[in-house]
A protein has these predicted regions:
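Long, low-complexity, intrinsically disordered N-terminal extensions of eukaryotic proteins, enriched
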Residues: 3-27, 286, 295, 331-333
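Surface-exposed loop/turn elements that mediate protein-protein interactions on large endomembrane-trafficking
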Residues: 3-4, 27-57, 87-151, 175-204, ...
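Repeated scaffold domains used in trafficking and secretory/extracellular systems
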Residues: 4-14, 54-71, 151-163, 203-216, ...
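Residue position within the beta-strands of beta-propeller blades
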Residues: 19-22, 79-81, 166-174, 218-221, ...
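Hydrophobic, aliphatic-enriched repeat segments that assemble into extended interaction scaffolds
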Residues: 22, 34-44, 61-87, 158-168, ...
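P-loop NTPase catalytic nucleotide-binding module
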Residues: 73-75, 144-145, 161-164, 187-190, ...
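Hydrophobic transmembrane helix bundles of membrane-integrated enzymes that assemble
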Residues: 102, 192, 219, 277-280, ...
């Protein structure tokens, strides 16, 4: 089972039986679990009498929640520590630097007590001074940590096949480089979850992961008649005639199958062939038309399946502001892109019939439409049904996907952790 992190913006993970996410506390993050069968959210800890506020707690992770990514594989939960900001500075030097910076007198820290302010930054320092590592979480007994060499700080962890994490080196897109030299093979890595053993390998030049796909990985790379030059100006000219090759790559064997080729586009700002996501077993791509001085408009939506069969879904794009969002299985959640400033769920696209159904269900508390967080193996969705004034989730509900698509609000409320 390959799965790219659906909610990579907050490190959460949905394995079909539960939804795992982090919640931020003062100086640390707690790992929460929403069990679909029980409809209960709880701290991922079963230690009797645990207060969940020290490192002895299996669910406790120092610093900021955004520095961690969780993945559930089998009966074990793993947490990858993202260490882009690793620093070996001593606590005394770090603390003196923060006190001298004046941050203590600025929002939101000006409302904290001295003890709270120190606790916040001690947690951040603890996280930043921790090397790249993999935690194995046992809710009943604690967590074990396997440290990796510092070179792994430069890798993102993008996919998991149930036993191994796969990542790739973080590189700035070549078009933004001042100096050349990023045209060579893309560094990649794999980490065995059971042992923590890690090794590196390389992808093709310019290649990078897009998503888990058909039991393997979907990748993207530029293909040209001649090797792309390293000079920035020559590269910018040569890339115009390149094609974007989309492949199915099995990183365990190196077997590669070409699925489709797409023409290079100056509107491909993400350098991914205008890839949107994998939905219901197919890879989705959009075509774009540049609007001089004001970005681009989406024009055509196409798919390709594991056999390389292509299909046009939309031509033209039905609503200019619509973007494809969360994967609901048969249904794709469509969101309204308010000029890249905010997103709101607006409709569901049925991948089997092509029918588009407006999302009419509103939050019970807070404003706006409900949104998807996970999907259970039994066909139910975990949806946000309540939020506070700051947009933080306060309530979840579980509901059958087809019933939701029919407009139902007959969801089963989740008993939320009251921490």
């Amino acid at each position: 089972m390959y799965k790219r992190q659906l909610k990579s913006y907050n490190g959460s993970f949905d394995d079909g039986t539960a939804y795992y996410e982090f919640t931020q506390r003062l100086g640390y993050a707690l790992l929460l679990k929403t069990d679909y069968a029980a409809a209960v959210q709880s701290v991922c800890c079963a230690v009797p009498g645990c207060a969940h506020d020290t490192d002895a707690c299996p669910a406790y992770f120092p610093g900021r929640a955004g520095r961690y990514t969780v993945v559930a594989a089998g009966d074990t939960v793993y947490v990858w520590h993202i260490s882009f900001f690793y620093d070996d500075q001593s606590w005394d030097d770090y603390w003196a630097e923060k006190l001298a910076s004046g941050v203590r007198d600025r929002e939101p820290f000006d409302t904290l007590t001295d003890a709270e302010f120190e606790a916040e930054y001690r947690g951040i320092w603890t996280e930043q001074s921790t090397p790249p590592c993999l935690y194995a979480v046992d809710p009943a007994a604690g967590k074990t940590r396997t440290d990796l060499p510092l070179t792994y700080r430069d890798y993102t962890m993008d996919a998991c096949d149930g036993s191994t994490l796969y990542g790739e080196g973080v590189t700035i897109p070549y078009r933004t480089q001042v100096s050349p030299g990023r045209i060579g093979p893309t560094p990649a890595c794999r980490i065995d979850l059971a042992t923590g053993q890690a090794e590196t390998f390389v992808l093709e030049p310019t290649e990078h992961y897009l998503a888990g796909f058909d039991g393997a990985l979907l990748t993207c790379r530029y293909v040209a008649d001649a090797p792309l030059p390293t000079d920035a100006e020559q590269y910018a000219a040569a890339i115009q005639s390149a094609t974007v090759e989309i492949d199915r790559l099995d990183p365990r064997t190196g077997a590669r199958t070409g699925l489709t080729e797409r023409p290079y586009s100056n509107a491909d700002y993400e350098n991914n062939g205008c890839f949107i996501g994998v939905y219901n077993g197919k890879a989705y791509f959009e075509e774009r038309e540049i609007i001089p001085g004001s970005g681009f408009r989406r024009t055509v939506l196409t798919t390709v399946d594991a056999a390389g069969r292509a299909e046009t879904v939309w031509d033209p794009w039905p609503q200019a502001e619509w973007v494809l969002g969360d994967d609901g299985g048969r249904y794709i959640w469509l969101y309204r892109d308010n000029y890249n400033t905010s997103y709101a769920a607006c409709a569901l696209l049925d991948t089997e019939t092509g029918q588009i159904t407006p999302v009419t269900q509103a939050l019970q508390t807070g404003s706006g439409a409900v949104s998807l967080r996970g999907k259970a193996h039994d066909g139910r969705w975990l949806v946000v049904i309540g939020a506070d004034s700051a947009g933080r989730t306060t309530a979840y509900g579980l509901i059958d996907a087809d019933q939701f698509a029919a407009g139902s609000t007959d969801w089963q409320p989740v008993a939320m952790w009251q921490g």
